[in-house]
Amino acid sequence: MRTGIGIDTHRFADGRPLILGGVEIPGERGLAGHSDADVLTHAIVDALLGAAGLGDIGQHFPDTDEQWRDADSLALLRAVLERVTAEGWAVDHVDATVVLERPKLAPHRNAIRDSLAAALGSVNVKFTTGEKMGFVGREEGAAALAVATLEPIGP
């Protein structure tokens, strides 16, 4: 069994949708990024890559490569799951937290969890605020953290 941790942050940007776990969240602004800026899925991708010993998201999907511009992060997640599986690992569980002042995410919990569970299987998502401290508390951006546990495939 192996465990990996992932973290990601993105600034807010006007004129972009807020995508978390592949779900568009209604609100005034989204997150800036080369891809769809899904901070939650990016943290999960990094946790999976770390657990499998496969580096990090920037090595696999560099923001200097135009092919990843506006990429659907769930597609990146599925690609990483294929690589993890090819290395002989299966997802046991993923636990993730989004840190964001607003909008409030609790009403979207089931949709986000269901979206991620379709790819991952066992997943838990949590939400918290920055308690008005730091870049999250000043509503400059959002952060996400994830822990992934992998188990070997087969005997």
How should each PLM-predicted stretch be described?
Residues 2-8:
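Short amphipathic
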Residues 13, 17-26:
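Polyampholytic, low-complexity intrinsically disordered segments
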Residues 25-35, 63-68, 132-136:
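A short glycine/serine-rich beta->alpha loop
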Residues 37-45:
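Short alpha-helix carrying the canonical HExxH Zn2+-binding catalytic motif
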Residues 47-90, 101:
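Glycine- and Gly-Pro-enriched alpha-helical subdomains that act as flexible
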Residues 93-104, 108-138:
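Short, conserved loop-to-beta-strand elements that form functional interface hotspots
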Residues 136-155:
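C-terminal edge-of-domain segments
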